[in-house]
Amino acid sequence: MTTSARPPLAISRTFPLAAADAWDLLADPRHHPRWIPLTRVEVQGSPLAVGWRVVATSGPFARRGAPGVRDRMRLDFVEPPTTSSQGVAVFTKLGPLLLGTAEVRVAPRGDRASIVTWVEDVYLAGPLPPALTRRVLAPVLAGMVRLALWRAAREVASGHEEHPNEG
């Protein structure tokens, strides 16, 4: 679903969850602040529906409501997994700083496991060539994605996964 000549960053991890459960947990950005440091997420619209708006704000005091780097996104494609096919959610980054796409892919691996792949094809808005800023951002994004997937897996292993609509 990406348009760059360079392959996007894609990191996968196996989860001991059925694909539907992994999808509910990882495709929903309202969970992401638990795994991504210094980040808060605000949403507008119906969860995991095309057109859903998400703003992730990152910075030293972002979780306390302070300003930070805003990553505005719109969900442009959503297809949940089935017992036999991969699910995909594609978020288009709308600026003002970050452009491109982020995807969450969840593929079933039997009844009780799934492979989650988080894809980032992100570059900076502005005068510099997207190919250059993709390369600059790649190590930071790779670290963020690896950490988020590791923390999510640790949460699942501990049996403490939370849901946004629960108290």
What are these regions (language model features)?
Residues D24-H31, P37, A142, R146, ...:
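Short, intrinsically disordered, mixed-charge
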Residues P33, V43-T101, W150-G167:
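Glycine-rich portal/gate segments that line the openings of hydrophobic small-molecule binding cavities
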Residues A18, L48, P80-T82, R109-A113:
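Short strand-connecting beta-turns/loops that link adjacent beta-strands
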Residues P8, P108, S114, H163-P164:
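Extended beta-strand/beta-hairpin segments
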